[in-house]
Amino acid sequence: MELMKRNAVYIFVLISLCLLACSTIGIPNTYGLFYQPLSQILNVGKASATLHVSIAGLATGFSSPLIVKALKKVSCRTVMIIGILMLCLSGYVIGTVQNIMLVNIMGIFRGIGLACTSNVIITILTGNWYKARRGTISGLIMSFSGIMGSLFSPVVSAMLQNYGFRNAYLICAFIMFILALPAVFIPLRPEDVNMEPYGNDRVDIQDKDSYEGYYELSFTGKVFLTLMTTSFLVICVTTLTSYLPSYVESLNQSAQNGAALLSASMVGNVLFKFLIGISIDKKGVFFSFVTFMFISFLGLMVITFIPQNTAMLMVAGVIYGACYAVNKVAVPLTVRIFFGDGKYGEAYSVLSLCENIARSAIITIIGFIYDTSGSYLICFLIALVASLASSALMLYQQKTIKQ
């Protein structure tokens, strides 16, 4: 009976984290569909319409290290509740407001809300609750963000057409709220409820990678800076996702094709996150990083140079989605391997800050490049180079560890 209760708790935590990933990662991945109608409603340029996304990213990044420190003083439940309330407030205001300035202010609230509920919190909870099969479990949880994005993109597109921007945005905010609620009941650590992490008694995971790490954490050291650069290059690739619908429309294809490409990338998001988790458990994080980044590179090549063939474009969208797996599964597990469980929260929160600064800047830069040149080609070419460069840096880091 006791074993059944423990297993039930592990399953509840897993399901709640999957739903949280749907809410705070999956739904925001569909926000690219809102850029065009928002710019039209407020009569502003594409760069101005996406500025609140950049602001939210910066707020998430700067808040994440503070949230990790706050978890030492307040309960995880309190942090979650504050985050969910801020997401609800920002969603309501952005969905009803007529002023771009207020939209940008709400970007700060949304960013803090995401810091309390999104990537950093999800990966910390995953690491605290699951010691065995971390790659597979991390991949499964993060794949649900892709499931939500894949299923929800055409739904959002239909809501925009039938109900308009404001109602569609409010519905999305409400769904985020509902999906995030179960995670409020997850304790920060299983020890807080007199339990042990799943797989804690397995001999095969009592290794240096899982607990101690290979390096001492230094934010100005060569290891962290190289990892930060690698992560930045991956972000250069993943950030294009928000602009896939606009990119397709700029090629004089229908908005439905744009939504379909975004949905296809979310299918790849789901598939490759799950596969990379299994691959990491079997082949290691370095092999998996390089392999899946190259897969994404192939998809991006087709999207960039052969976008006229709709069938090929959709297949390429799926393949391109492998970059999500690298960003959301391989990079966090690399941080854990490098610096160990004890320093993971501190290290990944700072890396997340750097990622969000990069993502925010890149989103705005892409919008600016399009507004000034009328084309997304330069952005896609940069992403192709970044794909190869990130893999080269990861191979370099692997060589350094072996030495």
How should each PLM-predicted stretch be described?
Residues 62-100:
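Conserved MFS/SLC helix-loop-helix module at the cytosolic interface between two early adjacent transmembrane helices
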Residues 38, 116-130, 326-339:
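Intracellular juxtamembrane helix-capping segments at the cytosolic ends
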Residues 31-35, 219-276:
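Extracytoplasmic gate region of multi-pass secondary transporters
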Residues 63-75, 273-284, 370-371:
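Helix-to-loop junctions at the C-terminal end of transmembrane segments
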Residues 149, 338-373:
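A late C-terminal transmembrane helix in Major Facilitator Superfamily
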Residues 12-37, 42-46, 63-67, 152-153, ...:
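Extracytoplasmic
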Residues 280-334:
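C-terminal transmembrane helical hairpin of 12-TM major facilitator-type secondary transporters
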Residues 108-143:
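Cytoplasmic helix-loop-helix junction between adjacent transmembrane helices
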